[in-house]
């Protein structure tokens, strides 16, 4: 370690990998002035936009996506892995990395293998309730294994939550509520339902909630609905005096959206659950019906603390909204109980915790190397 600590973040590909990495980067910069931070990615991932926007250095390697079925890609995989590991080892040497923090995904796998070869200590963070292949490999030789939940399939883990950007973790919903509702055109005393399906929206959520628009309006419920830039949303013509149904392709100010809302209907990806619970917002989670049920598992902790409900995508309907969501939104006592349960499940300090662990690991490794000499 040459005076300042150098950290390599391996979390490229999707927002679910990049956003926790950037939250930890911000925490590292706040905790350790002068820390050198480098993100590892590929030209295909969202990191090519998100990392430079946050002001951090980005190094690109050959992508190593794991094929989901037998194909020519499977035969080329060993060659791609070797090339990506070689490239990553060169980057580790160039930046004089003291520690690698991996967040899973196809960027993390070569990072773990390269770090092991270069004898750079590894910290693994798993955001999902069911760990992927990369983190299963990395956990075998990591110094510390951190997780959002207690049993992601990585053996012994330290539960720290999922790192979330500070604009969310520092949000005071009650203090910002009046400003947030004015921003979207809602009354101060409105009951507001927030609907979103991630950065791309969710068609089934769109169809169901828009189909329940009349029932929501009849109950006096305002709606803030982010339907996704690639989707369209059809709504009935409002009747005179109906509360607003604000439909937008994308919400650039999720902090204001969370502050304005009393309840959310959303998917249960790891980052969504982390943000919604960090701000203490009650939610109806609709797991994406793909994979091995990871999204249902992601929502389990907040459901167990009483901060949310889970409904299968196939069971979500306009009738469900009318029969379950409307009564919930009009029950002040139940909303207050769910708010407390959501906050109990959330981890506002996850990014700082991961950053502290990584800095400790880097210092311990540096001390060990000095001792060997």
UniProtKB/Swiss-Prot annotation:
Official protein name in the record: UDP-N-acetylglucosamine--N-acetylmuramyl-(pentapeptide) pyrophosphoryl-undecaprenol N-acetylglucosamine transferase
Keyword tags: Cell cycle, Cell division, Cell membrane, Cell shape, Cell wall biogenesis/degradation, Glycosyltransferase, Membrane, Peptidoglycan synthesis, Transferase
Membrane topology: Peripheral membrane protein
Gene Ontology BP annotations: carbohydrate metabolic process; cell division; cell wall organization; lipid glycosylation; peptidoglycan biosynthetic process; regulation of cell shape
Disulfide bond sites: none
Chemical reaction(s) catalysed: di-trans,octa-cis-undecaprenyl diphospho-N-acetyl-alpha-D-muramoyl-L-alanyl-D-glutamyl-meso-2,6-diaminopimeloyl-D-alanyl-D-alanine + UDP-N-acetyl-alpha-D-glucosamine = di-trans,octa-cis-undecaprenyl diphospho-[N-acetyl-alpha-D-glucosaminyl-(1->4)]-N-acetyl-alpha-D-muramoyl-L-alanyl-D-glutamyl-meso-2,6-diaminopimeloyl-D-alanyl-D-alanine + UDP + H(+)
InterPro entries recorded: GlcNAc_MurG, Glyco_trans_28_C, GlycoTrans_28_N
Molecular-function GO term, any one: undecaprenyldiphospho-muramoylpentapeptide beta-N-acetylglucosaminyltransferase activity
Function in brief: Cell wall formation. Catalyzes the transfer of a GlcNAc subunit on undecaprenyl-pyrophosphoryl-MurNAc-pentapeptide (lipid intermediate I) to form undecaprenyl-pyrophosphoryl-MurNAc-(pentapeptide)GlcNAc (lipid intermediate II).
Pathway: Cell wall biogenesis; peptidoglycan biosynthesis
Localisation per UniProt entry: Cell membrane
Binding residues for UDP-N-acetyl-alpha-D-glucosamine: 14-16, 128, 165, 199, 295
Cellular-component GO terms for this entry: plasma membrane
Main location: membrane
Family: Belongs to the glycosyltransferase 28 family. MurG subfamily.
EC class (word): transferase
E.C. number(s) listed in UniProt: 2.4.1.227
């Amino acid at each position: 370690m040459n005076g300042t600590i150098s950290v390599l973040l391996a979390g490229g590909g999707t927002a679910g990998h990049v956003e926790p990495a950037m939250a930890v980067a911000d925490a590292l910069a706040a905790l350790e002035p002068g820390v050198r931070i480098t993100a590892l990615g590929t030209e295909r991932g969202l990191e090519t936009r998100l990392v430079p926007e946050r002001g951090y250095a980005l190094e690109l390697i050959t992508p190593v996506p794991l094929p989901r079925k037998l194909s020519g890609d499977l035969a080329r995989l060993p060659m791609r892995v070797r090339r990506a590991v070689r490239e990553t080892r060169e980057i580790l040497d160039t930046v004089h990395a003291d520690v690698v923090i991996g967040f899973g995904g196809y960027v993390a796998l070569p990072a773990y293998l390269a770090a092991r070869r270069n004898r750079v200590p590894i910290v693994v963070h798993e955001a999902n309730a069911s760990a992927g292949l990369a983190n299963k490999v990395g956990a075998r030789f990591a110094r510390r294994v951190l997780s959002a939940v207690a049993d992601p399939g990585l053996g012994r883990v330290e539960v720290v939550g999922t790192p979330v950007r500070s604009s969310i973790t520092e949000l005071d919903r009650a203090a910002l509520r009046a400003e947030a509702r004015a921003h979207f055109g809602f009354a101060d005393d409105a009951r507001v339902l927030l609907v979103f399906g991630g950065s791309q929206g969710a068609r089934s959520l769109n169809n169901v909630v828009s189909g329940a628009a009349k029932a929501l309006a009849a109950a006096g419920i305002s709606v803030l609905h982010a339907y996704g830039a690639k989707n369209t949303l059809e709504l009935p013509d409002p009747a005179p005096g109906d509360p607003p149904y604000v439909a937008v392709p994308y919400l650039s100010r999720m902090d204001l959206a969370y502050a304005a809302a009393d309840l959310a209907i959303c998917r249960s990806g790891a980052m969504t659950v982390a943000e919604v619970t960090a701000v203490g917002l009650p939610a109806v989670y609709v797991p994406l019906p793909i994979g091995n049920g990871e999204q249902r598992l992601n929502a389990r902790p907040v459901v167990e603390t009483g901060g949310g409900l889970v409904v299968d995508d196939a069971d979500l309907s306009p009738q469900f909204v009318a029969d379950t969501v409307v009564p919930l939104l009009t029950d002040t006592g139940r909303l207050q109980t769910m708010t407390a349960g959501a906050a109990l499940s959330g981890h506002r300090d996850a990014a700082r915790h991961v950053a502290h662990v990584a800095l400790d690991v880097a210092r311990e490794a540096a001390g060990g190397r000095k001792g060997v000499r």
